Amino acid sequence: YVEGIQDGIADSPEKMKRYLDTIHTKAEVIDDLVNNLSVFSKLELSRLTFEFKEGDINLFMRDFVDDYRLDLEKNSIKLETDIPTDEVIVRMDYEKMSRVFSNLIDNAVKYRSEDNPTLSVSTMCSDGGVYVNISDNGIGIEENELKNVFEGFYRVDSSRSIKGSGLGLGIAKQIVEKHGGKIWLKSDGLGKGTTAVVFLPKI
């Protein structure tokens, strides 16, 4: 596309915009891949440092979701939240867990339904910890693929037409496990949405 611009093939404003949009999209994919590869390799070699602090996960999630509201509105995605005001203290690295939840919300946005797209975020205390659920009503995942989604570079068949490195969930899993927690996905199948669940132990 760059060569096309240099060679004068983009001979109209509309074609130029199309070329530039494509270049921008591909650059974002490359940047995402390089960034994820860096984090993934550090995690694999146990070189990624963590700075754990005690904090209220409910307050953290309310603030975190608020930061996404404008982007969700721009994409005409309905946001539903059920995050109690009760204080729930966990020990976490705020930057690393922000990366985890960003990845999960970005996935929910990327794989959203074309018809009335909805994103739901909730927290619930049980089993000595807190469950954070991030759900969409999008393309869903077949049951036989759920066990593979956290492997590095794995892409489910239904998502391969959508840009992504296939590293995000693998990184999220390793980060959550460093917190003594667990992460998994649930789906009733293709076209029935997906729920990402993160469990973190309470203090």
Identify the function of each model-found stretch:
Residues 45-50, 89-92:
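Conserved micro-motifs of the catalytic ATP-binding
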Residues 108-109:
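Short helix-loop "hinge" at the ATP-lid/N-box region of the Bergerat-fold HATPase_c
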Residues 181-182:
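Conserved glycine-rich
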Residues 25-30:
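Short alpha-helical segment of the dimerization/phosphotransfer core of two-component systems
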Residues 168, 172:
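Short alpha-helical Gxxx[C/S/T] motif in the catalytic ATP-binding
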Residues 141-153:
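Short conserved segment of the HATPase_c
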Residues 51-54, 73, 78-88:
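Conserved catalytic submotifs in the C-terminal HATPase_c
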